[in-house]
């Protein structure tokens, strides 16, 4: 493996309970990979390991040196990894703009914050407090915060599961735009079949306890995509059959 981010033979246990066993994946530049599977199969644990938020595991995480570039690196990108969680986790005493720029010294780059907010559909909302946002708006702010450091890789842990179906579709379309406009690689954790195949170039189906990758699906469709595409319906059916065969539904 030689991608931007490589996970090699990852194993993880909580005491005597093994939660991950021999998981390997690679994320290439500009690629979107979905980790699809039921609750409890280790998807979120694997993402935390990839993000560097959990170092109590066996195996290897290899990050391409480009992820360590400073602010003056190629194309003005700082490199590194951005993370978006299931809940927005906005600090309630800060404005939306302050939340987005908080990680880099309290709005050192206000113009960049304004651009990010515009790109995620929150133009003019920078002065609002989190309590004034809807759930979908708060998650848009969280995505902007994840992009603030100009990362090469964005990791998302079920980022749209807490919003209604219509808001979820709008946020999925927003993520497609982000991938194209920012030329970013994405690792997405989801339990939603439609979401996994609509957004990803590759879908890694996880299951079992301890969790492992059961099957890999390639999605050979250009973006933007049509949710009604026959190819997507076929791939969803294949994944559903595999999940039923593995008794994970």
Swiss-Prot record:
Its EC number is 7.6.2.14. It comes from the Bacteria. GO terms for cellular component: plasma membrane. It is an enzyme of class 7 (translocase). Disulfide bonds: none annotated. Residues 5-233 form the ABC transporter domain. SUPFAM superfamilies: P-loop containing nucleoside triphosphate hydrolases (SSF52540). PROSITE patterns: ABC_TRANSPORTER_1, ABC_TRANSPORTER_2, SSUB. SMART domains: AAA. The keyword Cell membrane applies. It is a peripheral membrane protein. The complex is composed of two ATP-binding proteins (SsuB), two transmembrane proteins (SsuC) and a solute-binding protein (SsuA). This is Aliphatic sulfonates import ATP-binding protein SsuB 2. The gene is ssuB2.
């Amino acid at each position: 493996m030689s991608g931007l981010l490589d996970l090699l033979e990852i194993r993880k246990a909580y005491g005597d309970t093994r939660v991950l066993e021999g998981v390997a994946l690679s994320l290439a530049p500009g690629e979107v990979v979905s980790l699809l599977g039921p609750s409890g199969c280790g998807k979120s644990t694997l993402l935390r390991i990839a993000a560097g938020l959990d170092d109590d595991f066996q195996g290897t995480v290899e990050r391409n040196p480009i992820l360590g570039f400073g602010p003056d690196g190629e194309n003005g990108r700082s490199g590194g990894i951005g993370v978006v969680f299931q809940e927005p986790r906005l600090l309630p005493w800060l404005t939306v703009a302050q939340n987005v720029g908080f990680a880099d010294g309290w709005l050192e780059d206000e113009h960049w914050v304004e651009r990010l907010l515009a790109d995620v559909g929150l133009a003019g909302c920078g002065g609002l407090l989190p309590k004034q946002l809807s759930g979908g708006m708060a998650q848009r702010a969280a995505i902007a915060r994840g992009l603030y450091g100009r990362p090469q890789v964005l990791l998302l842990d079920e980022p749209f599961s807490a919003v209604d179906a219509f808001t979820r579709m709008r946020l999925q379309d927003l993520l497609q735009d982000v991938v194209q406009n920012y030329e970013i690689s994405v690792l997405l954790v989801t339990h939603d079949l439609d979401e996994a195949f609509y957004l990803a170039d590759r879908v890694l189906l996880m299951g079992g306890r301890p969790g492992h990758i059961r099957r890999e699906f390639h999605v050979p469709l250009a973006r933007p995509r049509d949710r009604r595409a026959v190819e997507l319906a076929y791939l969803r059916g294949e994944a559903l059959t595999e999940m039923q065969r593995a008794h994970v539904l």
